[in-house]
From Swiss-Prot:
One of its GO terms (biological process) is SOS response. GO terms for molecular function: ATP binding; ATP hydrolysis activity; ATP-dependent DNA damage sensor activity; damaged DNA binding; single-stranded DNA binding. It is found in: Cytoplasm. Changing residue 38 to A: In strain: ATCC 17587. This is Protein RecA. Disulfide bonds: none annotated. Changing residue 161 to T: In strain: ATCC 17587. The gene is recA. It comes from Stutzerimonas stutzeri. PANTHER family: MITOCHONDRIAL DNA REPAIR PROTEIN RECA HOMOLOG-RELATED, RECA.
Length: 347
């Protein structure tokens, strides 16, 4: 840059700092780049698919899928992981359907969980914004976007047309709270439902509720689907689940994870550790037998997982090695801008 441009830039920066305060404009090279802090989802495979070890703090996340696909279970698992780190969590229950007993089974400390059951969409989003601006809440779940009913619709007659009200409400609210979420370093997760577009001849007819604003403001979007049932004999004890990362601004997108959700304990975590350990060559598999560092740990996946449950230190050791091999570290965060460009591209 020539001297005239340097002087002009220095004058402009000085004027900006004088008018808007120090730090209004920063030079990226003046500060060390740090890895984005994250909160585990409770699923090792999904943490790895997300690229940074979990869901990013200071960002908006959207989780959507069909009914009974595991959306609320996934968010409750995030709350349980955050609470184990000492974080404060809130659940904005617009559907009025939160089951405290089920949340407790998933490891959530329900006594410390902040819960709101708002009457209108405006009230729900205003409560969310106030919790974010308090700088005291680390994780907020909004369940769900489809249940954020505008006040005008609630007060109107059944059958009245209210075109675009919910979409305008979401657009206005997200414009308002996005900056606050970043400043508070708070993770806000919106659960969303799927609807079908009428008359679609090509491509997927599926769409999410609440307009397009959330698709743009979300740094991460997860598509969760139930792909099968987990059975013990004839009894169904869980669900085979697939999650696809359809948008990711903090790591490469379009990865996916498959895992089991057991109805009494959320994710079958030890089973994931065994599967990923075998994939990465950390756990040896010979026929039906599994071994770690030359020692047999069980015949069949269920017995090997039970061994890890009885010896948690070995499970943690294998998990740490898997994370070290597969996750993005602070040393290679220079790939982050590329990931952000890919996430916003029309592919």
């Amino acid at each position: 840059m020539d001297e005239n441009k340097k002087r002009a830039l220095a004058a402009a920066l000085g004027q900006i700092e004088k008018q808007f305060g120090k730090g209004a404009v920063m030079r990226m090279g003046d500060h060390d780049r740090q890895a984005i802090p994250s909160i585990s989802t409770g699923s090792l495979g999904l943490d790895i698919a997300l690229g940074i070890g979990g869901l990013p703090k200071g960002r908006i996340v959207e989780i959507y899928g069909p009914e009974s696909s595991g959306k609320t279970t996934l968010t409750l698992s995030v709350i349980a992981a955050a609470q184990r780190m000492g974080s404060t969590c809130a659940f904005v229950d617009a559907e009025h359907a939160l089951d405290p007993d089920y949340a407790g089974k998933l490891g959530v400390n329900v006594d410390d969980l902040l819960v709101s059951q708002p009457d209108t969409g405006e009230q729900a989003l205003e409560i969310t914004d106030m919790l974010v601006r308090s700088n005291a809440v680390d994780v907020i779940i909004v369940d769900s976007v489809a249940a954020l009913v505008p006040k005008a619709e609630i007060e109107g007659e059944m059958g009245d047309a209210h075109v675009g009200l919910q979409a305008r409400l979401m657009s206005q609210a997200l414009r308002k709270i996005t900056g606050n979420i970043k400043n508070a370093n708070c993770l806000v997760i919106f659960i969303n439902q799927i609807r079908m577009k009428i008359g679609v001849m090509f491509g997927s007819p599926e769409t999410t509720t609440g307009g397009n604003a959330l698709k743009f403001y979300a740094s991460v979007r997860l598509d969760i689907r139930r792909t099968g049932a987990v059975k013990e004999g004839d009894e169904v004890v869980g669900s085979e689940t697939r999650v696809k990362v359809v948008k990711n601004k903090v790591a490469p997108p379009f990865r996916q994870a498959e895992f089991q959700i057991l109805y009494d304990q959320a994710f079958y975590r030890n089973g994931e550790i065994i599967d990923l350990g075998v994939q990465q060559g950390l756990v040896e598999k010979s026929g039906a037998w599994y071994a770690y560092k030359g020692s047999k740990i069980g015949q069949g996946k269920a017995n090997a997982a039970k061994y890890l449950e009885e010896n948690p230190e070995i499970g943690q050791e294998i998990e740490q090695q898997i994370r070290a091999k597969l996750l993005v570290t602070s040393a290679n965060t220079k790939a982050t801008p590329v990931a952000e460009d890919l996430a916003d591209a029309d592919i």
